[in-house]
Curated annotation (Swiss-Prot):
<dbReference type="GO" id="GO:0030018">
    <property type="term" value="C:Z disc"/>
</dbReference>
<keyword id="KW-0393">Immunoglobulin domain</keyword>
<dbReference type="InterPro" id="IPR013098">
    <property type="entry name" value="Ig_I-set"/>
</dbReference>
<dbReference type="GO" id="GO:0070593">
    <property type="term" value="P:dendrite self-avoidance"/>
</dbReference>
<feature type="domain" description="Ig-like">
    <location>
        <begin position="582"/>
        <end position="670"/>
    </location>
</feature>
<keyword id="KW-0225">Disease variant</keyword>
<dbReference type="GO" id="GO:0030424">
    <property type="term" value="C:axon"/>
</dbReference>
<comment type="subunit">
    <text>Interacts with F-actin.</text>
</comment>
<dbReference type="GO" id="GO:0005925">
    <property type="term" value="C:focal adhesion"/>
</dbReference>
<feature type="modified residue" description="Phosphoserine">
    <location>
        <position position="241"/>
    </location>
</feature>
<dbReference type="GO" id="GO:0015629">
    <property type="term" value="C:actin cytoskeleton"/>
</dbReference>
<feature type="modified residue" description="Phosphoserine">
    <location>
        <position position="365"/>
    </location>
</feature>
<keyword id="KW-0963">Cytoplasm</keyword>
<feature type="modified residue" description="Phosphoserine">
    <location>
        <position position="357"/>
    </location>
</feature>
<dbReference type="InterPro" id="IPR013783">
    <property type="entry name" value="Ig-like_fold"/>
</dbReference>
<dbReference type="GO" id="GO:0008307">
    <property type="term" value="F:structural constituent of muscle"/>
</dbReference>
<feature type="region of interest" description="Disordered">
    <location>
        <begin position="487"/>
        <end position="513"/>
    </location>
</feature>
C-alpha cells in the first residue's frame, strides 16, 4: 500500500506534459497491438504489486506470530511465578493441624490450587477480551484508512493509467506511414479511442473491486492468525467457518478452547508435581527404616508374591508392615513407661536421707557414662543403676536405723536418770526451793517451746547444734539441783508428803519434753523424706539427661561418620556449595524437654537461590501458626513450640528445597513428665 501511495504522489506531483499533439497514423492492427501491450503492462504491474503486498503481509504475519509467541512465553513465566508466590503464601498462612491422613491433606492442597488456577484464568480471560476489543478497533481503523487510500488511488488512477499508457505508447509503438484517406482514419481512431477509454475505465473499476475483495479476507486471515497462535489445526478448521457476521463468536469459541487447554495442562502439571512429591516423601520414609526390618519386609514380600498381582501384594504387605511397626513402637513405649514407673516407685519407697548422695551418684553416673561408643543397652544400664541404688539405700537405711536405735537408747537412759533424780527430788524438804524450781521449770519449758519453734525453722546442722547445747545446759542445771538436794538430804530426815505431790510437776515436764522430742523427730523425718524425694527426682532427671546426652553424642558420631562417608571430604562440600543445592551447616539435634515447657529447633541452611524451608512432624507438614511458629534470621531457621504436650514427642524433620536440589535433617524430641 505504501508503494501505491508513493507512486500516486509521484504521478500527481510530476509536471511532465502529456504528448497529445502528435498522434501517429496507425492502422487497426497497430491500435490492437497497442491496447494489448498496455493491457499486459497493466497486468504485470498489478501482479508485481500483489506479489509485493503478499510478501509484506507474510513478513508481517511472521513478525506478529513471533512477537505473540514471545509474549505468550512471558505470560506463562509470569503465571508460573505468580503460582509459586501464591503457593508459598498459602503455606505461610495459619492452618490448624489436621488429624487426617496424608491423602486428605493432598486433596485439600489440590482444591486450593484449583481455586487459585480458576481465579487466574478468569482474570486472564477478561484481560484477553479487552485486548481483543482494542485490536478489533485498531484493525477497523486501519481498514477504514486503507479504503480511503484505495478510493484516492481510484480517483487518480485513470489519469495515471492514461499517462502510463501514453508513455508505453511512446516507448513501444513505432509509427508507420499513414494512409492517404485521412478522413476515414480520423473518424475510426476517435471511435476506437472512446471505446478504449470506456473499457479501461470499466476494467479499472473491476480491478479495484477485485483487489479490494482480495484484501478483505487477507486482513481477516491475518487477524485470526495473530489472535489464535496456540493451535494451528483448530485455526485452520475455524477459517472455513469464518464469515463477517460470525467473527466474534468464532474468536470466543477459540479463546474458550484455549483456556480449557491451558487449564487441563495446569491440572496435569499440578497432578504430576503432587505425584512426584508423594513419591519423594514415600522414598524418604522408606529410607529411614532400619536395614534389618527392610530385609525382613523384602523376605515377606517375596513370600507373598503372586504372579499378575505384584502391585496389590506389595501395597498389602507395606500396609501390614506399617501397622506392625506402629504396634511394636506402641508396645515398646508402653513397656518402657511401665518399667520406668515401677523403678521410680521402688526407688521412692526405698529412698533414705543421704546428704552426700548427689555428688556420689553424679560421680557414679559419670563413671558409667564414659565418652565413646556405648556397647550396652540403656535399659539394661538403667536397671543396673536402679539395683545398685536399691542395694545401697538398703544398707544406708540399716545403718541409719542402728544409729537411731543407739540414740534412742541413750535418750531413754537419760530419761531414766532424770526420773531417778525426780524421785530424789520428792525426798526434799525445802518446799520454797521446789516451788521456785517448778516455776523456773515451767518458765524454762515455755522458753524451750519458743526456742524449739525457732529451731524448727533452721537447718539440720543448726538443729543438732542447738539440741546439744540445750542438753548440756540442762545437764548442768540437773547437776546443780542434785548437789543442793544431797546437801539438804543429809541435814533433815523427815519428809513431807505435800512436797512429794508437788514434785510431780518436774516429772510431767520431762514427760512433755519427751513427747516434744518425738514430735520434733517425726517432723524432721517428714521433712527429710520430702527432701529425699526431691533429691531423688532431681537425680533421676540428671541421669536421664546424661543418658539423653550419651544417646545424642552417639547419634552425632554416627551422623558424622555417615556424613564423612557420604560427603567424602571438604572439597566435595565446597563443590556442593558451588552447585547451589541446599545443605545444612548446622543440622538438627535430639532434644528432651519437660512437659508443658517451650522448645526450639534451630538449623543453619545455605543454598543458591535461597531455599524454601518446611517443618515436618511424623511425616506431616507443620503450618506456621500459634502452635508451631516459623522464625527466620538470615541463614538460621527455627521452629518454636511455646508449649509442649506428651503427644508432641517424636521425630521432627526440616526440609530445604530450591531449584538446584533438596536436603533434610531429622531429630527426636523426648517429653519428660513433671512427676
Amino acid at each position: 500500500m505504501n508503494d501505491i501511495s508513493q507512486k500516486a504522489e509521484i504521478l500527481l506531483s510530476s509536471s511532465k506534459p502529456v504528448p497529445k499533439t502528435y498522434v501517429p497514423k496507425l492502422g487497426k492492427g497497430d491500435v490492437k497491438d497497442k491496447f494489448e501491450a498496455m493491457q499486459r503492462a497493466r497486468e504485470e504491474r498489478n501482479q508485481r504489486r500483489s506479489r509485493d503486498e503478499k510478501q509484506r503481509r507474510k513478513e508481517q504475519y511472521i513478525r506478529e506470530r513471533e512477537w505473540n509467541r514471545r509474549k505468550q512465553e512471558i505470560k506463562e513465566m509470569l503465571a508460573s511465578d505468580d503460582e509459586e508466590d501464591v503457593s508459598s503464601k498459602v503455606e505461610k498462612a495459619y492452618v490448624p493441624k489436621l488429624t487426617g491422613t496424608v491423602k486428605g491433606r493432598f486433596a485439600e492442597m489440590e482444591k486450593q490450587r484449583q481455586e487459585e488456577q480458576r481465579k487466574r484464568t478468569e482474570e486472564e480471560r477478561k484481560r484477553r477480551i479487552e485486548q481483543d476489543m482494542l485490536e478489533k478497533r485498531k484493525i477497523q481503523r486501519e481498514l477504514a484508512k486503507r479504503a480511503e487510500q484505495i478510493e484516492d488511488i481510484n480517483n487518480t488512477g485513470t489519469e495515471s493509467a492514461s499517462e502510463e499508457g501514453d508513455d508505453s505508447l511512446l516507448i513501444t509503438v513505432v509509427p508507420v506511414k499513414s494512409y492517404k484517406t485521412s478522413g476515414k482514419m480520423k473518424k475510426n481512431f476517435e471511435d476506437l479511442e472512446k471505446e478504449r477509454e470506456e473499457k479501461e475505465r470499466i476494467k479499472y473499476e473491476e480491478d479495484k473491486r477485485i483487489r479490494y475483495e482480495e484484501q478483505r479476507p487477507s486482513l481477516k486471515e491475518a487477524k485470526c492468525l495473530s489472535l489464535v497462535m496456540d493451535d494451528e489445526i483448530e485455526s485452520e478448521a475455524k477459517k472455513e467457518s469464518l464469515s463477517p457476521g460470525k467473527l466474534k463468536l468464532t474468536f470466543e469459541e477459540l479463546e474458550r478452547q484455549r483456556q480449557e487447554n491451558r487449564k487441563k495442562q495446569a491440572e496435569e502439571e499440578a497432578r504430576k508435581r503432587l505425584e512426584e512429591e508423594k513419591r519423594a516423601f514415600e522414598e524418604a520414609r522408606r529410607q529411614m527404616v532400619n536395614e534389618d526390618e527392610e530385609n525382613q519386609d523384602t523376605a515377606k514380600i517375596f513370600k507373598g508374591y503372586r504372579p499378575g498381582k505384584l502391585k496389590l501384594s506389595f501395597e498389602e504387605m507395606e500396609r501390614q508392615r506399617r501397622e506392625d511397626e506402629k504396634r511394636k513402637a506402641e508396645e515398646e513405649a508402653r513397656r518402657r513407661i511401665e518399667e520406668e514407673k515401677k523403678a521410680f516407685a521402688e526407688a521412692r519407697r526405698n529412698m533414705v536421707v543421704d546428704d552426700d548422695s548427689p555428688e556420689m551418684y553424679k560421680t557414679i553416673s559419670q563413671e558409667f557414662l564414659t565418652p565413646g561408643k556405648l556397647e550396652i543397652n540403656f535399659e539394661e544400664l538403667l536397671k543396673q543403676k536402679m539395683e545398685e541404688e536399691k542395694r545401697r539405700t538398703e544398707e544406708e537405711r540399716k545403718h541409719k536405723l542402728e544409729m537411731e536405735k543407739q540414740e534412742f537408747e541413750q535418750l531413754r537412759q537419760e530419761m531414766g536418770e532424770e526420773e531417778e533424780e525426780n524421785e530424789t527430788f520428792g525426798l526434799s524438804r525445802e518446799y520454797e526451793e521446789l516451788i521456785k524450781l517448778k516455776r523456773s521449770g515451767s518458765i524454762q519449758a515455755k522458753n524451750l517451746k519458743s526456742k524449739f519453734e525457732k529451731i524448727g525453722q533452721l537447718s539440720e546442722k543448726e538443729i543438732q547444734k542447738k539440741i546439744e547445747e540445750e542438753r548440756a545446759r540442762r545437764r548442768a542445771i540437773d547437776l546443780e539441783i542434785k548437789e543442793r538436794e544431797a546437801e539438804n538430804f543429809h541435814e533433815e530426815d523427815d519428809v513431807d508428803v505435800r512436797p512429794a505431790r508437788k514434785s510431780e510437776a518436774p516429772f510431767t515436764h520431762k514427760v512433755n519434753m519427751k513427747a516434744r522430742f518425738e514430735q520434733m523427730a517425726k517432723a524432721r523425718e517428714e521433712e527429710e523424706q520430702r527432701r529425699i524425694e526431691e533429691q531423688k527426682l532431681l537425680r533421676m532427671q540428671f541421669e536421664q539427661r546424661e543418658i539423653d546426652a550419651a544417646l545424642q553424642k552417639k547419634r552425632e558420631e554416627e551422623e558424622e561418620e555417615e556424613g564423612s562417608i557420604m560427603n567424602g571430604s571438604t572439597a566435595e562440600d565446597e563443590e556442593q556449595t558451588r552447585s547451589g543445592a541446599p545443605w545444612f551447616k548446622k543440622p538438627l539435634k535430639n532434644t528432651s524437654v519437660v512437659d508443658s515447657e517451650p522448645v526450639r529447633f534451630t538449623v543453619k541452611v545455605t543454598g543458591e537461590p535461597k531455599p524454601e524451608i518446611t517443618w515436618w512432624f511424623e511425616g506431616e507438614i507443620l503450618q506456621d501458626g500459634e502452635d508451631y511458629q516459623y522464625i527466620e534470621r538470615g541463614e538460621t531457621y527455627c521452629l518454636y513450640l511455646p508449649e509442649t504436650f506428651p503427644e508432641d514427642g517424636g521425630e521432627y524433620m526440616c526440609k530445604a528445597v530450591n531449584n538446584k536440589g533438596s536436603a533434610a535433617s531429622t531429630c527426636i524430641l523426648t517429653i519428660e513428665s513433671k512427676n
